[in-house]
Amino acid sequence: MNAARLFRFLILLVVIAAAFFAWRYFRPSQSDSANEATTTQHASPQGQGQNRSGSGRRGSTAPPPVQAALSSSSSVPYYLSGLGTVTAANTVTVHSRVSGQLMAIHFQEGQQVKEGELLAEIDPRPFQVALIQAQGQLAKDQALLVNARQDLVRYQQLSKTNLVSGQQLDTQESLVRQYEATVKSDQGAVASAQLQLDYSRITAPFNGRVGLRQIDIGNYVTSTDNLLVLTQTHPIDVIFTVPESDIATVLKAQKSGQPVPVEAWDRGSQRILSQGRLLSMDNQIDATTGTIKLKARFDNTDDALFPNQFVNIKMKVDTLQNVVIAPSAAIQMGNEGHFIWVLNDKDQVSKHIITTGIQYGQQTVVSNGLNAGERVVTDGIDRLTEGARVEVLAPAAADSKSTAGAEKPQHEKSQHNAEKS
């Protein structure tokens, strides 16, 4: 029992001794505390100065940098835009006008052909035989007519001496007229047979592009069979629509006596495909869409347009003379409507409420609220307030600042990696 108590007493002494030595080891000395206090006292004025200086730098406000451009006065073309579909000027499904065996095809699929060019041939022999028969019948009846006319002349001479009765003379005259009618009928039969023979040669009704053939050589064709589709692409048309509110503008342009120019652009309105002119306008408005159809014609000599192709149409209907234009980037939208920031000679900005018109390229027509020759802010607009002074950057300076701003994160990232390593 006494041994156990002694053992616990010894352990307690060891713990107390360890705690004492630990306290002595980690406790700072008085000289260190004094030095630290002295250093703090000497450093405080400089640190406070630095804080005041840093605070002063954060409190200072530099003029925000902006880019500016001059408004100007110019003549601006006025375009109407619409979505159009290319249509062939003429389209025909070619049939055979006679029935028979298809003997030959004289075109290549997709080929451009001229008006009257031979496309295909039907077996002509049955029609040649029919023509010969008709010509033979005509020759026979013509001979009978000649003989009847000669007999009529004799009867007329004999009737003067009463050797031929009047009835015989009348009968002969009637026979001559009968043969004359027969000859006319035979002439019609010959012409019909000749026409059937001509129809065995199928030709192009106009200049155009041949489509895919729809029947092969050797087949028996009739007038109901489709041989091919021919489309006229030189020239070619585009059908497009404009809102009914623009009808008066289009009519005014048509009445000017000058062709109304029309441009066809690709789907993205990035590349012009062809230039043409307005051809006609429909005679009624589509009540479901509130638009009216117009047709424009293009020469299309380079085959830039193809039937059923979708294109964007720009039609020049007027030219606005001496209007004020400003960069579209400078025009903003707010509660009061469109506005623009204008710079005075002291590089101070003021907000002008404006009325905008049509947009032409990167410029917009300003019909009210801005004069030609005024400087307007095009970049840095989000930091502006009424009457604030700004720093107007030259284009080169603006580009360099933009480049520096873009490179700064990369520089900071490299520096951070260097410190980290």
Curated annotation (Swiss-Prot):
Q: Which Pfam family, an example, fits this chain? A: HlyD_D23
Q: What is the superkingdom listed in this entry's lineage? A: Bacteria
A single GO molecular function, which one? efflux transmembrane transporter activity
What membrane topology does the UniProt entry give?
Peripheral membrane protein
Q: Where is the protein found, in the record's own terms?
A: Cell inner membrane
**Compositional bias of type Polar residues: which residue ranges?**
34-45
* Regions crossing the membrane: none
The similarity annotation says: Belongs to the membrane fusion protein (MFP) (TC 8.A.1) family.
What's the protein here called? Multidrug resistance protein MdtA
Q: Which organism is it from?
A: Dickeya zeae (strain Ech586)
